[in-house]
């Protein structure tokens, strides 16, 4: 079995391509179920955010797994593999494990050290568990990753100076306007990104804020928290006439603001400029709007320069976290290496218990007048003897499994205890394809 990551992210692809490979939240479970039925794929988790779409998979063959995951991406988004391939980065084995740790800890984010990705990884993992797309390996790996990411943020100061993408959008507005007190700000979208932007706007002195959302009640709840006003999305054109700054993050699949709409609005704004920051992927605002004279459009990739603040300080903390990651990878690989010895240990235990059971039957035939209490006491103590005898051999087997040339040594181990290899191999196949649903993960 092999661990594989296929990634398209802000480093490898511009936003105009990333938006073509973005899974909507409502379709994520169906996507993981579909991927689970692809050839070679044994387990999978799909993570799709504004800055990355990544497929984490356990596959039986690396070459076959790579091909069918790329084919799945191309087919799902109705593209050719040749269109998708140049923008993909593929991580395998140790590189894949390290990448998952780094992403979850915020070390691979545009904003180094941000914590939002931790929640996104956790949510994706839980969704994958719901549709039984994870198994023995990913259930262990993702729980270990989430636990470490939480510890990394509590034991270092990397998150203290990190800014979110929403914060960066507000900072860009401040660079352009200076004080935001007299600016009319329009927020499109009442999700997490929109609320973070509104929270940062309020902290920067903005008080003339309008929130718009397809579901008006969500906009009203969010606006009320920060002394803003809520309006239905049907009044968007009128709201654009009043705004000085627009921050948009709706999660819509099509443009919410088109060039045609903005052309009409500009004619009624009497030359007043409108600064628009689109932090949605797929984008909410037609990029062609940037061609208009009075509209100044920035997308999520344009925020790179803004988020560089305090980067050197955060990179020092990132080095500490990378060391923690390397320690965790060693622990995970040790666990992974012992996974293959589980069927051998299981066969050894079963053989020992079979001997104990036969011994108890023989004893009961020879001493038929045993009371129930006496039978239980004898059974308990004979099982205790077995456990004591097996303790050291099992520990040795686990140590051997982590060594080079383990297969030959474990074969000798099986021969010493006269274990049937066909039975061991059958158990190994069961472990390999086992789906274990363990929904409890560390809280954030």
UniProtKB/Swiss-Prot annotation:
SUPFAM superfamilies: Glutamyl tRNA-reductase catalytic, N-terminal domain (SSF69742), Glutamyl tRNA-reductase dimerization domain (SSF69075), NAD(P)-binding Rossmann-fold domains (SSF51735). The active site is at 50 (nucleophile). Pathway: Porphyrin-containing compound metabolism; protoporphyrin-IX biosynthesis; 5-aminolevulinate from L-glutamyl-tRNA(Glu): step 1/2. It comes from the Bacteria. Pfam families: GlutR_dimer, GlutR_N, Shikimate_DH. The record marks 99 as: Important for activity. NADP(+) binds at residues 189-194. GO terms for molecular function: glutamyl-tRNA reductase activity; NADP binding. Homodimer. This is Glutamyl-tRNA reductase.
């Amino acid at each position: 079995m092999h661990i594989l990551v296929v990634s398209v992210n802000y480093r490898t692809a511009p936003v105009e391509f990333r938006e073509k490979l973005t899974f909507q939240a409502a379709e994520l479970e169906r996507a993981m179920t579909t991927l689970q039925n692809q050839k070679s794929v044994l387990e999978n988790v799909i993570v799709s955010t504004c800055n990355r779409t990544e497929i984490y998979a356990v596959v039986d063959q690396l070459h076959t797994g790579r091909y069918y995951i790329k084919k799945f991406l191309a087919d799902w988004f109705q593209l050719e593999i040749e269109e998708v391939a140049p923008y993909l980065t593929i991580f395998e084995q140790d590189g894949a494990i390290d990448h998952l740790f780094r992403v979850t800890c915020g070390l691979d984010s545009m904003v180094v050290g941000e914590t939002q990705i931790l929640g996104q990884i956790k949510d994706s993992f839980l969704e994958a568990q719901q549709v039984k797309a994870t198994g023995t390996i990913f259930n262990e790996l993702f729980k270990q990753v989430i636990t470490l990411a939480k510890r990394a943020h509590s034991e270092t100061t990397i998150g203290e100076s990190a800014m979110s993408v929403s914060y960066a959008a507000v900072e860009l507005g401040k660079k352009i306007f200076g004080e935001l007190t007299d600016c009319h700000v329009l927020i499109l979208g009442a999700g997490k990104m929109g609320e973070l932007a509104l929270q940062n706007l309020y902290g920067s002195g903005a008080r003339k804020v309008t929130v718009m959302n397809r579901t008006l009640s969500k906009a009203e709840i969010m606006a009320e928290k920060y002394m803003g006003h809520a309006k239905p999305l049907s009044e968007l054109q009128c709201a654009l006439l009043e705004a000085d700054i627009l921050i948009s993050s709706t999660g819509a699949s099509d443009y919410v603001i088109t060039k045609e709409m903005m052309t009409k609005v500009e004619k009624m704004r009497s030359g007043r400029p409108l600064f628009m920051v689109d932090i949605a992927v797929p984008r909410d605002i037609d990029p062609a709007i940037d061609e208009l004279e009075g509209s100044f459009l920035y997308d999520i990739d344009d925020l790179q320069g803004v988020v560089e603040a305090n980067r050197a300080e955060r990179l020092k903390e990132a080095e500490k976290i990378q060391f923690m990651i390397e320690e965790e990878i060693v622990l995970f690989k040790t666990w992974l290496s012992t996974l293959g010895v589980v069927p051998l240990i299981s066969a050894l235990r079963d053989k020992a218990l079979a001997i104990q059971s036969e011994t108890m039957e023989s004893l009961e035939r020879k001493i038929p007048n045993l009371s129930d209490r006496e039978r239980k006491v004898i059974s308990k103590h004979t099982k205790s003897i077995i456990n004591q005898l097996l303790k050291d051999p099992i520990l040795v087997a686990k140590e051997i499994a982590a060594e080079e040339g383990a297969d030959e040594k474990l074969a000798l181990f099986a021969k010493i205890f006269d274990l049937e290899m066909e039975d061991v191999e059958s158990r190994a196949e069961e472990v390999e394809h086992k789906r274990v649903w363990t929904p409890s993960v560390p809280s954030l």
